[in-house]
Design a protein with these regions (language model features):
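Hydrophobic face of amphipathic alpha-helices that form TPR/SEL1-like repeat modules
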Residues: 8, 13-15, 25-69, 392
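Conserved C-terminal structural/oligomerization subdomain of aldehyde/semialdehyde dehydrogenase
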Residues: 25-27, 31, 72-76, 260, ...
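Residue-level signal for inorganic ion chemistry
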Residues: 71, 107, 129, 151, ...
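Glycine-rich loop-to-alpha-helix module at the N-terminal edge of alpha/beta enzyme cores
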Residues: 72-161, 172
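Short, well-ordered beta-strand elements within core beta-sheets of diverse protein domains
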Residues: 73-80, 95-101, 187, 296-299, ...
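Structural signal for hydrophobic packing residues in well-ordered secondary-structure cores
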Residues: 96, 100, 115-122, 126, ...
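Rossmann-like NAD(P) dinucleotide-binding subdomain of oxidoreductase/dehydrogenase enzymes
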Residues: 163-308, 434
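ALDH superfamily catalytic-core signature
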Residues: 270-414, 437-438, 477, 526-528, ...
């Protein structure tokens, strides 16, 4: 058993070991100095955060946080009670009046401190993330870093949230707009990016002057909570950021609470559709980023080595558990001859625990996820797809109990097959072949999802044609995962998104603020009274 170090006196503690009596030992809470792990044979409990204080839930419903490579019990997480959810929302509501009047510069300085703290603790948080989610350490660091970029962008809110001004729109009349915060915002985040997705949400919401209630994934909340600890350490005031844990009941409570003004969601299509409908019916502003079936179109003139490396990395990285993972490869013309080389690349990838050096593909999040993936692979075989590379029976030495699925490739796939119509969310690539680029564009556009697509080519003309005619919100040219940097917005479309405005960039500032238009005319003593104006005109 490894040694656990404890926090210094006065530091916020969101991981608390269980004592023999079940009471909290406030002097021995896990800190940022160590990853959550078993203490004296009992797992630490994850706390709620309400009004700036760690709160032990009174619920009887606790779930286990399991290392997907080892099945080690890392912690237990509570499903918050209705009263605890209400307290968190009301804490955010009460904090809003003061926080919205906090000068923009003061909010920005908190974000500047926050980004420095996240950068300082990034390697340590990555170890926690890898342990609870299964990602390789390098990918876990990337998860955090892509979120860190959003914090950095939040430091520019002084220019991002500026309004507009036009003088003398009529005689002596000026019109200008203000961007003002909307109130309590809620965020519901998925298991596959426990750092990046929360950081898409609460830093931008808070720096815009809102307060926030976060519900992380119950499957891997530990790294998220470490990021929350750092936000409080950076100076986020009590009540401005709150955290509750749970499942559907918590989601529904946030979507229907009278004091919540906006809901941000990233996750599956089924849950995202439910969130959008329920929250919209209760008058909330909603952004819902959902499932995907991302295609990569390969032209024969593409750089062969670069393309194959990109496809293998985008298809099998993070064990395929990315909403922007490449899941379908469309070979155009003679490029279908590259399939054996793609299989060879996939065979070279090392499947192991994310903590092991040199690992390329870690485990999937849970035994249930593995069982679902394997069932879909069986369906693919039954439907007649060719199992070109079979990762179903992989065993990892030293981690025989891990939730591993090896890189898997199906060829001869058709659009009618369930494996094509369903987001598998595992290390599985489907391969299709078409004669022309026009056929490829038609194929991709006929799929209901619209998160991302890639084109691999050396032809500028082909690339321009593709980006113009493809009906997908995010396009990569010789880039397999076209997730924009935070200066631009995440613009997934069609069946992958509900709501007009996406995460981060300019769109999220619009989402987290409301526009107020002011039309003003000032008079002095010399102003001549023009009499009563009964028309709509400004004169």
């Amino acid at each position: 058993m490894r040694t656990v170090r404890y926090s210094r006196q006065g530091q916020l503690n969101l991981f608390v070991p269980r004592s023999g009596t079940g009471h909290i030992n406030q002097e021995s809470a896990l800190s940022m100095n160590a990853s959550p792990q078993t203490i004296s044979g009992t797992p630490p409990k994850v706390m709620l955060l309400i009004d700036g204080k760690p709160v032990e839930s009174s619920t009887r419903d606790w779930r286990e946080v399991i290392n997907p490579a080892t099945q080690e019990l890392l912690a237990t997480v509570p499903f918050a009670t209705a009263d605890e959810i209400d307290r968190a929302v009301r804490s955010a509501h009460e904090a809003f009046e003061k926080w919205k009047r906090t000068p923009v510069g003061a909010r920005m300085r908190i974000m500047l401190r926050y980004q420095a703290l996240v950068r300082e603790h990034l390697p340590r948080i990555a170890k926690t993330l890898s342990a609870e989610q299964g990602k390789t350490l390098a990918d876990a660091e990337g998860d955090i870093f892509r979120g860190l970029e959003v914090i950095e962008h939040a430091c520019s809110i002084g220019s991002l949230a500026q309004g507009e001004f036009l003088e003398n729109v009529a005689g002596g009349v000026d019109t200008y707009t203000l961007r003002q915060p909307i109130g309590v915002c809620a965020g519901i985040t998925p298991f596959n990016f426990p750092a990046m997705i929360p950081l898409w949400m609460f830093p931008m919401a808070i720096v815009c002057g809102n307060t926030f209630v976060l519900k992380p994934s119950e499957q891997d909340p530990l790294s998220t909570m470490q990021l929350v600890e750092l936000a409080i350490e950076a100076g986020v005031p009590p009540g401005v950021l709150n955290v509750v844990h749970g499942g559907k009941e918590v989601v529904d409570a946030l979507c229907t609470h009278e004091l919540v003004k906006a809901v941000s969601f990233v996750g599956s299509t089924a849950v995202g559709t439910h969130v959008y409908r329920l929250a919209s019916e209760h008058g909330k502003r909603v952004q819902s980023m959902m499932g995907a079936k991302n295609h990569a179109v390969v032209l024969p003139d593409a750089n062969r080595e670069h393309t194959l490396n990109a496809l293998a990395g985008a298809g099998f990285g993070a064990a395929g558990q990315r909403c922007m993972a490449t899941s379908v490869i469309v070979f155009v013309g003679e490029s279908h001859q590259w399939l054996p080389d793609l299989v060879a690349k996939a065979k070279l990838l090392k499947v192991n625990a994310g903590s092991e050096p040199g690992t390329d593909v870690g485990p999937v999040i849970s035994r249930a996820a593995k069982a679902r993936i394997l069932a879909l692979l069986e369906t693919g075989v039954a439907e007649g797809a060719t199992l070109t590379l079979d990762g179903r029976s992989i065993s990892v030495r030293g981690y025989e109990d891990g939730n591993f699925v090896g890189p898997t490739i199906f060829s001869d796939v058709t659009t009618e097959m369930q494996i094509y119509r369903t987001e598998i969310f595992g290390p599985v690539l489907l391969v299709m072949s078409v004669p022309t680029l026009d056929d490829a564009i038609a194929l991709v556009n006929s799929n209901p999802y619209g998160n991302g697509v890639g084109l691999f080519t050396s032809s500028g003309a082909a690339a321009r044609k593709f980006q113009t005619e493809i009906d997908i919100g995010q396009v990569g040219i010789n880039i397999p995962i076209p997730v924009p940097v935070p200066y631009f917005s995440f613009t997934g479309s069609r069946g992958s998104k509900l709501g007009d405005l996406g995460p981060y960039g300019k769109q999220v500032v619009q989402f987290y603020t409301q526009t107020k238009t002011v039309t003003a005319r000032w008079f002095d003593d010399a102003t001549v009274n023009d009499g009563v104006n009964t028309t709509i005109s400004l004169r």
